[in-house]
Amino acid sequence: MAPRRNNGQCWCLLMLLSVSTPLPAVTQTRGATETASQGHLDLTQLIGVPLPSSVSFVTGYGGFPAYSFGPGANVGRPARTLIPSTFFRDFAISVVVKPSSTRGGVLFAITDAFQKVIYLGLRLSGVEDGHQRIILYYTEPGSHVSQEAAAFSVPVMTHRWNRFAMIVQGEEVTLLVNCEEHSRIPFQRSSQALAFESSAGIFMGNAGATGLERFTGSLQQLTVHPDPRTPEELCDPEESSASGETSGLQEADGVAEILEAVTYTQASPKEAKVEPINTPPTPSSPFEDMELSGEPVPEGTLETTNMSIIQHSSPKQGSGEILNDTLEGVHSVDGDPITDSGSGAGAFLDIAEEKNLAATAAGLAEVPISTAGEAEASSVPTGGPTLSMSTENPEEGVTPGPDNEERLAATAAGEAEALASMPGEVEASGVAPGELDLSMSAQSLGEEATVGPSSEDSLTTAAAATEVSLSTFEDEEASGVPTDGLAPLTATMAPERAVTSGPGDEEDLAAATTEEPLITAGGEESGSPPPDGPPLPLPTVAPERWITPAQREHVGMKGQAGPKGEKGDAGEELPGPPEPSGPVGPTAGAEAEGSGLGWGSDVGSGSGDLVGSEQLLRGPPGPPGPPGLPGIPGKPGTDVFMGPPGSPGEDGPAGEPGPPGPEGQPGVDGATGLPGMKGEKGARGPNGSVGEKGDPGNRGLPGPPGKKGQAGPPGVMGPPGPPGPPGPPGPGCTMGLGFEDTEGSGSTQLLNEPKLSRPTAAIGLKGEKGDRGPKGERGMDGASIVGPPGPRGPPGHIKVLSNSLINITHGFMNFSDIPELVGPPGPDGLPGLPGFPGPRGPKGDTGLPGFPGLKGEQGEKGEPGAILTEDIPLERLMGKKGEPGMHGAPGPMGPKGPPGHKGEFGLPGRPGRPGLNGLKGTKGDPGVIMQGPPGLPGPPGPPGPPGAVINIKGAIFPIPVRPHCKMPVDTAHPGSPELITFHGVKGEKGSWGLPGSKGEKGDQGAQGPPGPPLDLAYLRHFLNNLKGENGDKGFKGEKGEKGDINGSFLMSGPPGLPGNPGPAGQKGETVVGPQGPPGAPGLPGPPGFGRPGDPGPPGPPGPPGPPAILGAAVALPGPPGPPGQPGLPGSRNLVTAFSNMDDMLQKAHLVIEGTFIYLRDSTEFFIRVRDGWKKLQLGELIPIPADSPPPPALSSNPHQLLPPPNPISSANYEKPALHLAALNMPFSGDIRADFQCFKQARAAGLLSTYRAFLSSHLQDLSTIVRKAERYSLPIVNLKGQVLFNNWDSIFSGHGGQFNMHIPIYSFDGRDIMTDPSWPQKVIWHGSSPHGVRLVDNYCEAWRTADTAVTGLASPLSTGKILDQKAYSCANRLIVLCIENSFMTDARK
């Protein structure tokens, strides 16, 4: 049959071993640790389940689970999920860590939203000169640089477990290493509390984007304590036995961990059947929820409800630790077919350990555990199997003596605790007592464990080993099938010696036994009435065997105490001969009012404290010491009444003579104290209902508690699930023998009375400690019935135990190597006097059971459970992958962050806007004419604008000199033939600007150099182009003088006869008509206008034009006319620019002869001639002054470089607008978007600056466009079609709705809505609907393509570009680019 398991139910068995400590110290430790543990912050909760990438479980220090961090681990969350916004003023940080790299790394860090400043953190530095530093970061609000508050130099920590604590208190920082103070450093800080902004982040194993080294290695504990005293309290040597983990390093403790095999066999039905008694619900400590979470149990944890704890420790540093990895498998074994039929009530536990169980002291706390599955126990008998457990192969036991019985009492009291109910859906109202038991007894080594003197038969109990009773109800329905046909299961062991306790303080031993459920063994039925007799002052056990029913009839009479022995030495000499048995001690009786013990019955659970059996670490027996002085009253027991002292027993046989010791003062026995006040009945809390187990989903917001569904039919047996979280404390109930005083008062009056099934009331609060009672009278002498031989004498004091335990290789304790600890036995001591009055009594009887409470709400999700088995693969313990959770609603807008750091160098800026028209310049001074020698002919200059004609010396035809005319300025000597000269107009130097207003005529400039001879064909062509409209009729001119002959011109003629002026003629083809009589000079004509060119974008001012060539009849030009409409370059522009040589050759047929060509790529100059091109030689370079604006492009079309099919070529730039384009391919979340937009815009010939349509860590999306142009300019595509009315309208909160019929083009002219190059029609933006950056959804500032990281994007199918959809950053989506300002220079 496959093993049966209940969902959410787990059988766990752990053994508790510890080092001796007094009971007051144990009690004090528990209180301190409970106080210190409240409100601590466990930072390992950041890791979560399932584990992140590069994080895994490993076996950690002491066998606990730990987390292994690889190089790629990235654990971080918003700090507000774990850390309070206002941090503790004083605090402590506890760490258990094992680095695997010499580079150190950050253990944890709380940073600002930009992950640049560490507010609080711990870092390990790299290894330098055999040391490392532990660095504490503590940065107060307002600082923009991480501050190192303290740094401690420690030895290299790599590849070994290290335990340290950092304490920040007042003006000091203290480092504790292995519970010892390492050093202190002064710490200056302001009185202002450390506060974290709401957008702060907390990281584990790294520090975000700060650039600090990541931690690689194993991390087991990382806890922040609000009380800075907590680490010191947990490390107190007096409290080490109560600690839940070792304070020192396991490697250096020297305590060998020997894990004993535990087997279970079915024993004879004659073995004792023990009925467990459920303890009342104990208050749940904060650590109960952590027992199966995979976390180490914090120090000082003593209380538990679902398991007993193995504590073992080094004698040097003394704190125990829980071993939760020693149990290899826990599974059921088929029971008796008769009792198992269908109900499964007879399932056994078969616990097989393949490892050695750590054992540094003898003893197992008996842990009765009652578990309930989904059973109705009203009609199910609970008799049946009994499970006994024992450990094997220890070589020697330990015998506690009288001076250590107080510690023994504390040990036994704690180990008997942890009786727990594990509620499922069970009602225990009808459970018949004493039927189904699984008990485990750990027997001593070779001899049965004894505690004090007894009658010749005794009870196996506390000191060496106690028993564990497990009552189970697994999935039982009220079938009525009896389960008492199963024989008990008994596990035995073969030790060499027993662990016994000698006579001692009865008060302490009574306190020990009252908290320990003792179990009878034999064939007697449970519930039989105890034998009559005097009160039982002290529970005892026999050294060798179980008590039989016949022997029980003779117990109850007191024996006389042995004679007083002399004080022995310290026990450090050589071992002496064996000591004979001492005199008979007092016998056990029935109805021992203070012992918490009754025949055939169990006792109450005690106060609920769980104390390890450290008291059993003792040496071999030494000589008995004298009776000590009366000690101070011990800490009151919670459920014990001390019985009256017994009469002295008969003298036992004399022991071997020991060294004589001084006689001690006899002690005085006190009377029994008054019974304590009965506690008030407490109200029972509601039972919690178990919610349906859901598949783990992605991390989402916590949902409301789920409702419990109806029970379905039994399904197929599935694999065992991981351990569930601890349930709430169950209600106290009367089970087994039906005790009403489950607090352990020892009442045995109702042992044999069957109890009616009724609801169980919750246990009332514990009463306050009462005043010390008066000294009692000496009790009556008991009957002089000889008791069994007394135990051996007490051991010597252990002084060098830690050094002697290093080489232990077998058994619980191997003292063969410690001969110096064994002293010779001493003489028997005299009986002591009555002791002091007893302390206040225990809590009163339990009230009547209350009615069952309502089902509680579903509990919170538990921590990850510890994996206690190696039989089941890890993947079977983990649930199936959950469905993705719902996306959470966008969070509120965060507060305005602090000023950012200085950014990187920006992209090249756009050209500046044209300046305003300058003020009208003043008239310049006349130029000084300096006649110089004629220079060499210069290279041909570029064509210039027609110059103003200042002097007309003559026409191209010879004209005789007119003597009545004034001589022109700077003309050649009269009568000498020369070429036509022209004088330029002196102008003001200005910057590039808009067309200016009409300026005043400048003064006459200096005479220019002679020009080259003109070609007639060129001249005719040029004059035809310069043909103007008909001028006004001129006045009749006077007869001209005979002109000189100009022999340098090819065309000349004789002077004509004077004629009358004729009427105005039609427009002629030539400038000069036939020669007529000279007329009067005509007035200047109106300015001429050229034929308007095709409209085009405004171009820069052209270079100077060719020289004006005028005929004799041309009048002086008028003032400059208004600027004409801009046009594309026409054939009349004699200077044209091409991109390169190929472009010039392809367009040669479009260029007329005489046109100058400038090549942009090579900066060369050519002139078009008849058969081709001729290259012109240019002079030296004259650099442009630094303060001059850059020259405009020679072409007036900024988009002419786009390929022919590009729709941008037809874009209309006449109206101001901002252009929106897309990158030429899709991109994932890891992209240098701004650089791509700039680069692709330049490649497309767009001169303005384009920015990515994305939010960034430095800028919100809504602020990319220049502020002055967010409201006035439309947003258009590259064809000029309007997409949005203005930039601000996109961020109105409606998602940026646009007309889907207007396409969005890429820089290379493709429509992204239809082109298959963008398979996912989704646009990245990473912004809220109002254009605010969302740091959790913008692919880590567009620097990652990780699948686990998301960014916001908008599907084009919605007709919006700001729709709020989250996509994985690994997707390749559309990236848009926006022109961030209107650039007029690029479009002139």
Curated annotation (Swiss-Prot):
State the residue spans of region: Nonhelical region 4 (NC4): 799-822
State the name under which the record lists this protein.
Answer: Collagen alpha-1(XV) chain
Modification after translation is described as:
Prolines at the third position of the tripeptide repeating unit (G-X-Y) are hydroxylated in some or all of the chains.
Spans annotated as 4 X tandem repeats = 358-555
Looking at the record, which segments are called Nonhelical region 3 (NC3)? 733-763
Stated role: Structural protein that stabilizes microvessels and muscle cells, both in heart and in skeletal muscle.
Cite the residue spans of the region called Nonhelical region 8 (NC8): 1046-1052
Q: Where is this region: Triple-helical region 2 (COL2)?
A: 619-732
Q: Which residues form the Collagen-like domain?
A: 619-680, 681-731, 823-865, 879-927
Relate the assembly described in the record: Trimer; disulfide-linked.
Short name of one Pfam family:
Endostatin
Region described as Triple-helical region 5 (COL5) = 879-949
For bias kind Polar residues, which ranges apply?
A: 240-249, 379-392, 452-472
For this record, the Gene Ontology CC terms, alphabetical, are:
basement membrane; collagen type XV trimer; collagen-containing extracellular matrix; endoplasmic reticulum; endoplasmic reticulum lumen; extracellular exosome; extracellular region; extracellular space
Residue ranges for the region (Nonhelical region 2 (NC2)) are 574-618
Residue ranges for the region (Nonhelical region 7 (NC7)) are 1014-1027
What stretches of residues are sequence repeats?
Answer: 358-408, 409-459, 460-509, 510-555
